[in-house]
Every structure is written in structure tokens, then in C-alpha cells.
Curated annotation (Swiss-Prot):
Name this protein carries in UniProt: 1-deoxy-D-xylulose-5-phosphate synthase
Binding site for thiamine diphosphate: 80, 121-123, 153-154, 181, 288, 370
Family: Belongs to the transketolase family. DXPS subfamily.
Phylogenetic lineage: Bacteria, Pseudomonadati, Pseudomonadota, Gammaproteobacteria, Enterobacterales
Free-text remark on how the cofactor is bound: Binds 1 Mg(2+) ion per subunit. Binds 1 thiamine pyrophosphate per subunit.
Cofactor(s) needed for function: Mg(2+); thiamine diphosphate
Protease found in the keyword field: no
Length: 624
């Protein structure tokens, strides 16, 4: 059921930013109110990222009002806050399809709209890409402007500072908007600071500023004195010294919910030369009390009733793999004070809330800094402690060199608890955990495990934690297990799988949580099923035995086929000169789009029906 746009009379006038720029400035607060309500009513029906968008309403309206999008470059970091941007850029009537199969993409996406200048999803990429676009715009010389919007979390990543350091060196015309949505508004925000921001960004101040620099440019001591004086005056009322040192002209902080003041400040800043940084303070979840009070829980939401102000509880009573991990952490830490758990800003998602409260001295949230997280763990291991890096599969990609250079080469005992392995679902291409088995399998000294259920996950985490001869990775999926009873912790034999079902002719070598589908298919085809458990080292003895006893081997994994566990089986068989037909089933050579997890598995032939169909087709071909 679509939303009746007639209930939003000002928003109804705005299909695109061109329409927005025709509105009188005085109508913008009304537009913001309607846009906020529209976002509430749409996301509550569709699910999606919520609190961030509520906090970015005024900024979104002001940016599209002042800048000539899509001619000007507007880049959103991560993209959680970009739902209002999508609503204002011709996608209002489809916003209720966001994150669904064949619906709007959850993040800004270049193939979806000319207003989306950069595909995003991972953090802290906006300033680097924006800097490249700004340099290209200068070469183009058509007056195109570039704006990057980045949050206070994303700007903590090293990549953002690398980009700002470079921008300060080459001095392009660009604007970085720091959307600071901490829980409380800064003391500096208010009438005085809003007025100061407009003054410091105004023509008179900037003319005097640049003119003075030109006059005294030949007298280095005086030029330096002017620079220090300016920084001192600004430093008395604004916290921008760090950004000034990087070469940015800092303006702010200002109230990010005063759309009229934002429009004035952005208008003043639009034609300033060199790198500019506008620091705005916003409230995550603004305008909806439950989200304001608990922005973490309301960051990404299922469908809910806006009138009740409560989020529905999951109907699945089985624990998630993330919770299994978090509970195991607490159980292990209870008897080992050398356990150190690390997360790059994913405490809630990784199931570490309980651990962080019960063992605060052994818990480290290093912010959005995956590279640092891994090398920090390496240092802890060298110091005699037992580090565990809890990280999503898709984010481990950002720390690949550190895994190799700082951990594996030195054979350091670091346990990688890799969450969201395989198909993640609604967040789409940027968040599927499709590649970890492939990019980890080729690293020497690395042990890799993939559990088939939640009990096996616990045992593998325990095994990896107590293995002290090198790094270990345990990868597990998003979502709940199958309800397997949890057994007391014990170490598994390294590199050994087990037979789950004995059959004939066909042997399915399963890696990970597709085991129920494998067993379902095996019942129909009377196939053998092996729960391989280890991707590296492979159970050579078991694989060769299955190859000798069966006509066809089928490898099954929720990872890219190229370079994955099945590729490892192929390599082993070739090395042993064992000639047997092998069917590799897994993720194809494409970036897996958004949709429900079960929808995607069905589309890719990784549900029981698809697996059976693929095996029968391969079997028929082999018999010709």
C-alpha cells in the first residue's frame, strides 16, 4: 500500500532537486517536517536504516537547495543517511521497496540514479573519491562543485584522514560536511556559533583573509603571524584546529537542524577556494522520540508500528550465531584473563554487548579501523595475550595486508571470528560475505573453519582460541542456527571432517551452514554427506576416500566458487592424480544483489531444490 502524497503538500511539489530549488526559502522548514514524517511512515512499512536518515533531513534539503545537483557532485559516506536524498531525487514513490529484491538499493548506487555519484556501503570512502572528483572538476573547468558528507564515526577511519591530508596538500575546491550526531548537542551550538559560522564563511571575511595573505605573502614571518592569529581567534570558539592543521578551512560547529541557517552557511561556502570543512551537530533519530532515546536500536529496523514506538521481537527463538559467539566469549573469559576481544565499531552486530559489560578491561572497540584492529591484535599476541578479532566478512577485506604482513607471516595466534560469512541479504553487493574463504585460503600458516551449526561454531571458536601455533579463522553466517543442542566445549582435531550420512554414488562435501540442504538432497538422491569443517587444512584422507568410493563429488559452500573451498578440493584431487568428476556449487562470479537470504539462495540454486537440480543435471551430463 503506497503512501498518500496528498498528506504531504509541500513534499508533493518536489519530485527532484530542481523542484526543490523553486521553493521559497521560508517553506523549507515545512518541507523538512513533511519529509521526516514521510520517512517515518515509509521505513516503518518497508524496514531499513532509519535513525541516521531522520538526523540528516535538514542537511539533505539544504545541500540540494544550494548546490546544483546532479551537475555538482554530492557524495554520501556509507549511505545509511541517504534515504531522504533518495526521496528528493525522483525515487519517492519507490522508497518502500528499499533493500528488497529488485527494489531501491539500500545505499547510493550509480546505476540507480544520476544523483548518486558514488556507490557506497563501506565507511570512510567519500573524501578520497570526492577529492578525485574535485581534481577532475578543476581539469574540466566548468564550475562543478564537490561536497562530501561524512559522519563522526566514519571520519575516525585512517582513510578519511589520508584523504584530508592529501587534499590539504594539493588544495582543491571541495567541501567536507562533518555530520556529527553524537548523543548530545555540543555546547558551542547555538545562536553565537551559527552567527560565527556565517561570518567566517561570508564574503567580507574571506576577502579580507585571502587579501591579507596576498599582501603579506612575501613576508614569511608576518604571513605566519596572521595564520596563527586567525587560528587563535577561531580556536577560542570552535574545535577545528586539527582540520586546520590538515589544510582545511574549518567552519562550525553549527546546528544541523536549522535548515535556514544551513542554507545561508552553505551558500556562503559554495564559492570558497580550497578545501573547506563544515562541522554540523545533529541528533540521530531526530523527530521520533523512541529513535532519539535509543538511536542504536533504531539504526536499522524491521517493519514496525510508529504509533507504539516499539520494535517487534524476532519470532525466531533460536540464538543467532552472533549471540553464540558473544556467549562463548564470556564463557572463555571466565577462566582466562588473557583473552582480549577486539571489534572495529561493531559491538552490537557482533554480539559483544554482554562481554563489553562483564569484561570491560578485556574489551576493545577500536572504532572504524579494521587495519588497526588486526595489527593491534598482532601486538597483543606478541605481548603474550590471546586476541580475538570479531569482524564482519565484508569488513575484513579492508585489513587484508595486515592479516598477511602483521599476523600470518609471524605465525601469531590471533583468532578471527568472522561474522556475516556468505549471503547477508538486504544490504546488497557491498555487504555480502562472498570472498573470505577465497582470500584467506591462499595465506600460509592460516587455519580456516566453517561450522555447520551453532554447537559446531562454539567448538570451532574454542579450538581456534586454544591453537597457539598461528592464526585461525572461524567464519559463520548472519542469522540463527538450526537449534542444535550446545555441548560442553572441547577441541576438535585439526583438519578433520566427519560423515553425516552414508550413501552411494554421489558424495556431497559440505563446507558451512548449508548442511541441512545437503542432507535434504542426500535423502532424495541417496548421497553421502560429509561435514568437512575445515577449509584449510582440508581433510585429505577423507576426500580421497570419498573420491574412491563415489562416482561424483559435489562441493557445497556459501562463498565464491572461484578460489573457495571447492577449488581447494579440485587442487587436492589434481595433485593426487585422482580423476573423479567434481561439481562445485557456491556463489557465482558476480556481486550478489540485495534480497532476503532465502530469496537469494533460491535464485542462485543454493536451496535444496536448486542443489538437487544442479546435481541431477551434472549427473546426466556425466553419464553421456
Amino acid at each position: 500500500m503506497s503512501i498518500d502524497i496528498e498528506k504531504y503538500p509541500t513534499l508533493a511539489l518536489v519530485e527532484t532537486p530542481e523542484d526543490l530549488r523553486l521553493l521559497p526559502k521560508e517553506s523549507l522548514p515545512k518541507l523538512c517536517d513533511e519529509l521526516r514524517l514521510y520517512l517515518l511512515n515509509s521505513v516503518s512499512r518497508s524496514s531499513g536504516h532509519f535513525a541516521s536518515g531522520l538526523g540528516a533531513i535538514e542537511l539533505t534539503v539544504a545541500l540540494h537547495y544550494v548546490y546544483k545537483t546532479p551537475f555538482d557532485n554530492l557524495i554520501w559516506d556509507v549511505g545509511h543517511q541517504a534515504y531522504p536524498h533518495k526521496i528528493l531525487t525522483g525515487r519517492r514513490d519507490r522508497i518502500d521497496t528499499i533493500r528488497q529484491k529488485n527494489g531501491l538499493h539500500p545505499f547510493p548506487w550509480r546505476d540507480e540514479s544520476e544523483y548518486d555519484k558514488l556507490c557506497v556501503g563501506h565507511s570512510s570512502t567519500s573524501i578520497s573519491a570526492g577529492l578525485g572528483m574535485a581534481v577532475a572538476a578543476e581539469q574540466e573547468n566548468l564550475g562543478r562543485k564537490t561536497v562530501c558528507v561524512i559522519g563522526d564515526g566514519a571520519i575516525t577511519a585512517g582513510m578519511a584522514f589520508e584523504a584530508m591530508n592529501h587534499a590539504g596538500d594539493i588544495n582543491p575546491d571541495m567541501l567536507v560536511v562533518l555530520n556529527d550526531n553524537e548523543m548530545s548537542i555540543s555546547e558551542n551550538v547555538g545562536a553565537l556559533n551559527n552567527h560565527l559560522a556565517q561570518l567566517l564563511s561570508g564574503k567580507l571575511y574571506t576577502t579580507l583573509r585571502e587579501g591579507g595573505k596576498k599582501v603579506f605573502s612575501g613576508i614569511p614571518p608576518i604571513k605566519e603571524l596572521l595564520k596563527k592569529t586567525e587560528e587563535h581567534i577561531k580556536g577560542m570558539v570552535v574545535p577545528g584546529t586539527m582540520f586546520e592543521e590538515l589544510g582545511f578551512n574549518y567552519i562550525g560547529p553549527v546546528d544541523g537542524h536549522d535548515v535556514i541557517a544551513l542554507v545561508q552557511t552553505l551558500t556562503n561556502m559554495r564559492d570558497l577556494k580550497g578545501p573547506q570543512l563544515l562541522h554540523i551537530m545533529t541528533k540521530k533519530g531526530r523527530g521520533y522520540a523512541p529513535a532519539e532515546q535509543d538511536p542504536i536500536s533504531w539504526h536499522a529496523v524491521p517493519k514496525f508500528d510508529p504509533k507504539t514506538g516499539t520494535l517487534p521481537k524476532s519470532p525466531n527463538a533460536r540464538p543467532t550465531f552472533s549471540k553464540i559467539f558473544g556467549d562463548w566469549l564470556c564463557e572463555e573469559a571466565a577462566t582466562d584473563e588473557k583473552l582480549m576481544a577486539i571489534t572495529p565499531a561493531m559491538r552490537e552486530g557482533s554480539g559483544m554487548v554482554r562481554f563489553s559489560k562483564e569484561y570491560p578491561a578485556q574489551y576493545f572497540d577500536v572504532a572504524i579501523a579494521e587495519q588497526h584492529a588486526v595489527t593491534f591484535a598482532a601486538g597483543l599476541a606478541i605481548g603474550g595475550y590471546k586476541p580475538i578479532v570479531a569482524i564482519y566478512s565484508t569488513f575484513l577485506q579492508r585489513a587484508y595486508d595486515q592479516v598477511i604482513h602483521d599476523v600470518a607471516i609471524q605465525k601469531l595466534p590471533v583468532l578471527f571470528a568472522i561474522d556475516r560469512g556468505g549471503i547477508v541479504g538486504a544490504d546488497g553487493q557491498t555487504h555480502q560475505g562472498a570472498f573470505d574463504l577465497s582470500f584467506l585460503r591462499c595465506i600460509p600458516n592460516m587455519i580456516i573453519m566453517a561450522p555447520s551449526d551453532e554447537n559446531e561454531c562454539r567448538q570451532m571458536l574454542h579450538t581456534g582460541y586454544h591453537y597457539q601455533e598461528g592464526p585461525v579463522a572461524v567464519r559463520y553466517p548472519r542469522g540463527s542456527g538450526v537449534g542444535a543442542p550446545l555441548q560442553p566445549l572441547s577441541e576438535l582435531p585439526i583438519g578433520k571432517g566427519i560423515i553425516r550420512r552414508q550413501g552411494k554414488s554421489i558424495a556431497i562435501l559440505n563446507f558451512g551452514t548449508l548442511l541441512p540442504e545437503a542432507l535434504d538432497v542426500a535423502e532424495k538422491l541417496d548421497a553421502t554427506v560429509a561435514d568437512m569443517r575445515f577449509i584449510k587444512p582440508l581433510d585429505k584422507e577423507l576426500i580421497l576416500s570419498l573420491a574412491k568410493q563415489h562416482d561424483i563429488l559435489v562441493t557445497l559452500e556459501e562463498n565464491a566458487i572461484m578460489g573457495g573451498a571447492g577449488s581447494g578440493v579440485n587442487e587436492l584431487l589434481m595433485q593426487e592424480r585422482c580423476l573423479v568428476p567434481v561439481l562445485n556449487l557456491g556463489l557465482p562470479d558476480l556481486f550478489v544483489p540485495q534480497g532476503g537470504q532465502e530469496e537469494i539462495r533460491a535464485d542462485l540454486g543454493l536451496d535444496a531444490t536448486g542443489i538437487e537440480k544442479s546435481i541431477k543435471a551434472y549427473q546426466a551430463h556425466s553419464l553421456r
